């Protein structure tokens, strides 16, 4: 999906600007035991801005993606996970954990995709690490899908606090539809069965939710920071899923070319007779 990187880069730039325009509220999210809250708000904003530009123009994009993935992992470890542990019965707290992991997983999948295009085989560590983005987004999809059936009145995609406005047609039906796709895609991703197809269809489904639900909300309240955040938050989720789909596509293509090269080498005149006899 060629739009995955763009759908990921644009929200990064939007959220970066909020670190400079809404610094006080952003700094308040930093844990108390970390000093210099304002500094970290500006630093993360600058990092997101540079990363968004890097991804958009594809200059040092994989390095930027790796740094973004590490940043979201830090968010999970120092903010989201402690908050979820402190409030274990809050579904929104765990939604935040899975959301940040999904964002980081999409960036991590893009950063790892470079290994699938290299002429030399990837290291065993890289092969094992490539499983993590698929599992993270798969588990998040399963959890989010279940929430869509328990609370269909809330906005689809990432099931947070906002309730879908009643004036949007087909909101409940769409919520159930997105929930079904999330669960089915989550099963495929976790089981690694038709994972690329599942990720692609899931990304397109989340994009449908962005256009059907979040865009009208943003148009109806263009000055609302909440509407802006929900729109680009879900678009970022869509981008992360499509980046995963793209990485899985490259992985499949690399495996195909590797097998084809092995067959070609076996049939080459310079290959030993024993090698040619093993080829079906």
Give, region by region, the residue ranges found by the protein language model.
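Short juxtamembrane and helix-loop transition motifs at transmembrane-helix boundaries
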Residues: 22-34, 155-168
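Extended, low-polarity transmembrane helix blocks
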Residues: 1-21, 39-50, 56-153, 169-184, ...
């Amino acid at each position: 999906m060629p739009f995955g990187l763009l759908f990921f880069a644009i929200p990064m730039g939007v959220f970066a600007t909020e670190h400079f325009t809404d610094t006080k509220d952003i700094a308040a999210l930093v844990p108390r035991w970390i000093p210099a809250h304002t500094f970290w708000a500006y630093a993360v904003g600058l990092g997101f801005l540079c990363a968004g530009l890097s991804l958009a123009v594809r200059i040092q994009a994989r390095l930027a993606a790796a740094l973004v993935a590490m940043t979201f992992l830090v968010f999970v470890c120092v903010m989201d996970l402690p908050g979820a542990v402190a409030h274990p019965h809050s579904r929104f707290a765990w939604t935040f954990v899975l959301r940040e992991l999904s964002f980081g997983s999409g960036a991590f999948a893009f950063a790892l995709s470079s290994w699938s295009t290299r002429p030399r085989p990837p290291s065993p560590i890289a092969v094992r690490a490539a499983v993590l983005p698929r599992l993270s987004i798969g588990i998040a999809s399963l959890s989010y899908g279940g929430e869509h059936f328990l609370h269909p009145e809330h906005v689809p995609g990432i099931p947070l606090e906002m309730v879908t406005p009643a004036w949007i047609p087909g909101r409940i039906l769409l919520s159930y539809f997105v929930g079904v796709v999330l669960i089915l895609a989550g099963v495929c991703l976790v089981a690694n069965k038709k994972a690329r197809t599942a990720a692609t269809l899931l990304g397109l489904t989340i994009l449908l939710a962005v256009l059907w639900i979040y865009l009208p909300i943003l148009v109806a309240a263009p000055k609302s920071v909440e509407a802006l955040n929900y729109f680009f938050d879900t678009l970022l989720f869509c981008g992360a899923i499509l980046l995963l789909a793209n990485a899985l596509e490259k992985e499949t293509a690399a495996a195909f070319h590797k097998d084809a090269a092995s067959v070609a080498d076996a049939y080459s005149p310079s290959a030993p007779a024993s090698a040619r006899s093993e080829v079906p």
